[in-house]
């Protein structure tokens, strides 16, 4: 049993490895899909698998250089209008990659994987900059760009890999070292956000048993379903109603 205090923050060397490995895992999953599977609808209502992959590619390539990142957010801001900038950014990513064949999309994602992992974790000054993010409940949080680069972008690709597996019925390739580390980091943030005692047993290769305080609720669920619930993909009640950004 692990207390949440024992779950250390993801270090920059870890972040680089997790980012590169997660993109490679997405490439492996997408590269094995049939034409029919590319057209399946996902848990993101506006996207089929093909559109979701276009977003992921846009995010991967968009964080391989400062000029590219700035241009992406400027274009996304224009598309968003009065709405959240991130919605415009994701729409821009899908639009810019919709002309690619699925083979081209996968090849470009594979080529950019190590570059984006390196660039995201070498931004010593940029990582300190604040970034305002609108949450699903309408509140606005201030994050650091380091949190975006080293945590959120990897979580985003990871959750979309889960989305693709859900849409296609494919079995996720999960390991304790990679997926378990991502899930543990989610557990630690979830615990900080709700601040209440609990014992949580997460089953599956990415799972573990976590605790905080005493006398709290006891929860048991699949590790992937836990994260899907916290990401808003599935309904949650009690402590599982506390969402975590992905």
Regions found by a protein language model. Give the residues of each.
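An amphipathic alpha-helical core segment
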Residues: 179-211, 215
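Amphipathic, well-ordered alpha-helical segments in soluble domains
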Residues: 22-25, 29, 59, 112-115, ...
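Short, helix-capping/interhelical loops that line the mouth of catalytic, cofactor-
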Residues: 1-14, 62-117, 121-122
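An N-terminal domain-cap segment
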Residues: 2-54
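Surface-exposed helix-capping loop/turn segments at secondary-structure junctions
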Residues: 32-38, 122-128, 166
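C-terminal interaction segments
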Residues: 213-246
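Internal, conserved structured core segments that host functional sites
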Residues: 97-154
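Short, contiguous alpha-helical
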Residues: 39-80, 132-193, 226
């Amino acid at each position: 049993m692990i207390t949440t205090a024992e779950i250390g923050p993801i270090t920059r060397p870890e972040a680089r490895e997790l980012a590169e490995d997660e993109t490679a895992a997405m490439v492996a999953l997408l590269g094995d899909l049939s034409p029919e599977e590319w057209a399946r609808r996902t848990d993101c209502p506006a996207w089929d698998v093909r559109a979701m992959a276009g977003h992921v590619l846009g995010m991967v390539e968009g964080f391989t250089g400062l000029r590219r990142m700035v241009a992406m957010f400027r274009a996304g801001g224009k598309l968003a209008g009065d709405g959240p900038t991130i919605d415009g950014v994701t729409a821009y990513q899908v639009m810019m990659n919709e002309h690619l064949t699925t083979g081209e999309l996968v090849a470009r994602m594979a080529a950019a994987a190590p570059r984006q992992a390196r660039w995201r974790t070498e931004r010593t000054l940029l990582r300190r900059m604040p970034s305002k993010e609108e949450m699903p409940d309408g509140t606005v949080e201030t994050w650091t760009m380091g949190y975006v680069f080293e945590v959120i972008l990897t979580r985003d690709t990871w959750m979309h890999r889960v989305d693709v597996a859900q849409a296609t019925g494919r079995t996720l390739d999960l390991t304790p070292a990679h997926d378990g580390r991502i899930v543990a980091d989610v557990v630690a943030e979830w615990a900080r956000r709700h601040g209440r005692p609990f014992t949580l047993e997460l089953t599956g290769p990415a799972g573990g048993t976590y605790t905080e305080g005493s006398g709290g609720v006891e929860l048991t669920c699949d590790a992937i379903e836990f994260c899907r619930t916290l990401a808003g993909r599935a309904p949650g009640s009690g402590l599982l109603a506390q969402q975590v950004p992905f």
